[in-house]
């Protein structure tokens, strides 16, 4: 085993606290800082929100208009939101735009949007 391989093995055996202490000791010994330059972190930080937007996992179904068949839409709203009574479902449909469901998977959001659209509502998945 070479000298470098032995060193790698020994460093791999360090605990996190020991590795942090080693880092501090080396910074003092060599007169350097382990912190990344601020300018280098800027572009990476700007790219992160774009990636997060592409990886959206939670969606909201928004009822934008109740349509002409409000009774059917109210029935479907009560079907997807059993916690709502008749009055609350009616108020939600008549008060459009309103969020019907929030923080659901894409598949569930699309299923709910399809049901409401078939009932005569105009919906949007965000």
Swiss-Prot record:
GO cellular component: cytosolic large ribosomal subunit
Pfam families: Ribosomal_L12, Ribosomal_L12_N
Keywords on record: Ribonucleoprotein, Ribosomal protein
Gene3D superfamilies, A to Z: 3.30.1390.10, Single helix bin (1.20.5.710)
Molecular function per GO: mRNA binding; structural constituent of ribosome
GO terms classed as biological process: translation
Keyword Translocase appears in the UniProt entry: no
Annotated function: Forms part of the ribosomal stalk which helps the ribosome interact with GTP-bound translation factors. Is thus essential for accurate translation.
Assembly information from the UniProt record: Homodimer. Part of the ribosomal stalk of the 50S ribosomal subunit. Forms a multimeric L10(L12)X complex, where L10 forms an elongated spine to which 2 to 4 L12 dimers bind in a sequential fashion. Binds GTP-bound translation factors.
PANTHER family according to UniProt: 39S RIBOSOMAL PROTEIN L12, LARGE RIBOSOMAL SUBUNIT PROTEIN BL12M
HAMAP family with a match to the protein in the record: Ribosomal_bL12
Family of the protein in this entry: Belongs to the bacterial ribosomal protein bL12 family.
Protein name as it appears in the record: Large ribosomal subunit protein bL12
The species this protein was found in: Caulobacter sp. (strain K31)
Name of the coding gene: rplL
């Amino acid at each position: 085993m070479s000298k470098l391989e032995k060193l790698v093995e020994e460093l791999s055996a360090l605990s996190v606290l020991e590795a942090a202490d080693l880092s501090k000791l080396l910074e003092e010994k060599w007169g350097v800082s382990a912190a990344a330059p601020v300018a280098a972190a800027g572009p990476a930080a700007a790219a992160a929100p774009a990636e997060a937007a592409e990886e959206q996992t939670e969606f909201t179904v928004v009822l934008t208009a109740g349509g002409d068949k409000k009774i059917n839409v109210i029935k479907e709203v009560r079907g997807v939101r059993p916690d709502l009574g008749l009055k609350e479902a009616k108020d939600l449909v008549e008060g459009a735009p309103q969020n019907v469901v929030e923080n659901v998977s894409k598949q569930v959001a699309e299923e709910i949007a399809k049901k409401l659209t078939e009932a005569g509502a105009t919906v949007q998945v965000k």
